[in-house]
Amino acid sequence: MSTLRLLISDSYDPWFNLAVEECIFRQMPATQRVLFLWRNADTVVIGRAQNPWKECNTRRMEEDNVRLARRSSGGGAVFHDLGNTCFTFMAGKPEYDKTISTSIVLNALNALGVSAEASGRNDLVVKTAEGDRKVSGSAYRETKDRGFHHGTLLLNADLSRLANYLNPDKKKLAAKGITSVRSRVTNLTELLPGITHEQVCEAITKAFFAHYGERVEAEIISPDKTPDLPNFAEIFARQSSWEWNFGQAPAFSHLLDERFSWGGVELHFDVEKGHITRAQVFTDSLNPAPLEALAGRLQGGLYRADMLQQECEALLVDFPDQEKELRELSTWIAGAVR
């Protein structure tokens, strides 16, 4: 029996596609290797720990019938239309390795005639006369026994619409050394005129099969033909809910934000009588777990620099691999509230 599984979605509904992804990830055998290919109609997809009101122009999105979808991985906000091809690779540990899935995508692009390379923490770029241009962005998620890598390839996306719905973080733009979103991305059609979603999916599928030395039949799925996934209706209801995608607007009396080399951080505090009655953390960090834990620790504590710093440093026990990030965060918070 093959250890591979290939699913291709005929749906353009971001909530359906992300719910399928979540279901498969939760329920797949640890020995299985999964490739899921999909695309979304007009959607802003935000990272698990992001604040949609800061990241998106929600008024313009509503006017233009652009959906908001919160994914379960970290990272930043992106705009999807039918000019994007989305891919998700899943595998159990210890086999899960994002460098393998990255190489599969690079091999697929090479087979199509595009020479691309990995750049930074989550991008694929091509070299042009104007410099490196991004053609793909990715995000990742890991649990104790499995992981996934998902991302998008820009085929023929309407790049002019990016600025309509995304509010660029000025500190992020400065940190990346760029002047505009449009200047740093390009479509694959600029390199391969006429390239289609179907051709890209076929190339990725062939590279996936070639890497593992196996082939399987594709499962074509849609809302009318859902895969056999227990609890899919429940997960779809959550994925499409306002509570998941927007949540409650943060009520705060003090806002702190900063951009570090590893991502942006925004802290929202409500403070009453010197105590933090509510703490929220939003971030586009690819590993938001320590920051999510920090929010819980700050709840109910004193709004004092030394106490906040102490709570940051206490997280080093649970997140030793993020020592650099936590120490930078601790120093910044202490200085910001003094």
Curated annotation (Swiss-Prot):
BP terms from Gene Ontology: protein modification process
Keyword Transferase: no
Record's keyword terms, sorted: ATP-binding, Cytoplasm, Ligase, Nucleotide-binding
Binding site for ATP: 71, 76-79, 134
Listed InterPro entries: aa-tRNA-synth_II/BPL/LPL, BPL_LPL_catalytic, Lipoate_ligase_A, Lipoate_protein_ligase_C, LipoylTrfase_LipoateP_Ligase
Main location: cytoplasm
Listed EC numbers: 6.3.1.20
Keyword ATP-binding: yes
Binding site for (R)-lipoate: 134
Catalytic activity: L-lysyl-[lipoyl-carrier protein] + (R)-lipoate + ATP = N(6)-[(R)-lipoyl]-L-lysyl-[lipoyl-carrier protein] + AMP + diphosphate + H(+)
Occurrences of domain BPL/LPL catalytic (ranges): 29-216
Cited function: Catalyzes both the ATP-dependent activation of exogenously supplied lipoate to lipoyl-AMP and the transfer of the activated lipoyl onto the lipoyl domains of lipoate-dependent enzymes.
UniProt miscellaneous comment: In the transfer reaction, the free carboxyl group of lipoic acid is attached via an amide linkage to the epsilon-amino group of a specific lysine residue of lipoyl domains of lipoate-dependent enzymes.
Family the UniProt entry places it in: Belongs to the LplA family.
Assembly: Monomer.
Name by which UniProt lists this protein: Lipoate-protein ligase A
